[in-house]
Amino acid sequence: MKSVLLGLILLLAGVGFPQVGRAQTPAAPDDKPATQPKKRGGIFTMYAMDPLSRTLCFTDGKEGMAFVNNKWENRCSDLSYTQAGNGSLVSGIELNRMATIVDLGTANDLRGRYSFEDAENGGVGFASLRLEGGKVTILQDDNGKFKASWQPLEESAKLFAESKSSANAPIQLGHIYLVRITDSRDKSFQQIVKLLVIAYRPDEAVTVRWELL
């Protein structure tokens, strides 16, 4: 099973990351469609040695793998934590999914590059990242009671560059990342997420704050 192969390779910290399809679990006749809205963000910890929560699903903010009828299957794996490369975030690991990951540096790095006002290790940069007109923008100036102004994010070009399967980036505590996921068969599909690494224990776990753009 491709999902099992994916998990085993992630567990062994391999270099290559084969793609895996999402498991389709038949619904019982009395099951009703979920009425909860799509989750827009949250905090999630991925554990290197946990077969379920080593991946994250951006649709509901839950663990990407599942035990189904005594089988280990992929449920919805949009982001993975692997020990490869001394600890990496990996995306574009499902069947037909492609991705790009861009490391924006720390909150202080963004403040320095884009010259907006923010506290030391503050949240202005992360909070202000947004999608506008097919590009990512960041705060330029907050005029208080007047309308804030925005500026293009220079790294947006890298985000919208050609995506690839199993895109990866080294994990850095306190760094902000942008992840863009596309589908090689469904050209209309696109998912863009911003991440902040808020805790990291190498070889064990990484905790991220994430939010859909």
Where are the regions a protein language model picked out?
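Positively charged n-region of N-terminal signal peptides that target proteins for export
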Residues: 1-4
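C-terminal segment of classical bacterial N-terminal signal peptides
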Residues: 13-22
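Surface-exposed, beta-sheet-biased, low-hydrophobicity segments with strongly acidic/polar composition
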Residues: 24-213
